[in-house]
Amino acid sequence: MCQYNKMFSHVYVEKGVAEHPRTKQILEKLNNTTVIEIDHYKDVFCRKKQSISAQSNAKALILAENTSGCIYEGAPVCQSFGNENFYYCSCMMNCIFDCEYCYLKGMYPSGNLVVFVNLEDIFAELEALLAQKSIYLCVSYDADLVAIESLTGFVREWIAFTKKHENLTIEIRTKSGRCDLWSNYEACDRVIIAYTVSPQRVAAEYEHFASAPMERIQAAKCAMDGGFPVRLCFDPMIYCKDWSCLLYTSPSPRD
């Protein structure tokens, strides 16, 4: 029987961020971890002949610096929800969950996770845009920030940054069932917590390691109780046999 290492048993750290405060904070939270210094994250993340399926069972963590910008204009086919200045941000690449249908499997050559620790530079890049116009920004498109919040603290920092900039609205999308954050973080009506939900059978079959749908719905209630606006996302829409029956298989949150 194949035995995998635990998640983040190996952490690759760019030499340029080895002394960065966020790098140190993240490493302090990891136990029994092998730390390997590298010159550039692409030396590991973009190397040839990686097995994404194998890596999904034992993800490595890569701590790096983004030097080319992280704020991108949203594509017309993506969900802007009527916002004119729609952007998305990649402060992390890849996800700790392993949904079979996820576009990230075809977007990245690796199943490992990259965290750009220089969040202050991303904020500076965004502030330059905010000086010109109001922005609607999706900050959790290429990763699930909520699911890894205990390690990075990025959700807390994004909320604090958004509260300081009245012409910024952000969406944080997740499949995590964490409820504790929303009573501990100060709410902001311009921080939308968006939960992707699926029928239980679909989630169990295809959304590996993600929280169960009812756990996500309960977390959405916790976010609402904490004062955050909440969005439920039925995405992607995938045809399934007996799909009409699946619509009624989840119990009510009130049960």
What are these regions (language model features)?
Residues 202, 209, 224-243:
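Conserved strand-turn element in the central/C-terminal portion of the radical SAM core barrel
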Residues 89-99:
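Cysteine-centered iron-sulfur cluster-binding motifs in ferredoxin-type domains/subunits
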Residues 62-85, 100-196:
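Conserved Radical SAM active-site core
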Residues 21-24, 148-151, 181-185, 205-207, ...:
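A short acidic (Asp/Glu
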Residues 248-255:
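Conserved small/polar residues in nucleotide/adenosyl-binding loops
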Residues 122, 216, 246-247:
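Aromatic/hydrophobic pocket-lining residues that form the small-molecule binding cavity
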Residues 1-85:
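Flexible, acidic/Gly-rich N-terminal and inter-domain linker regions that tether
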Residues 210-222:
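Glycine-rich S-adenosyl-L-methionine
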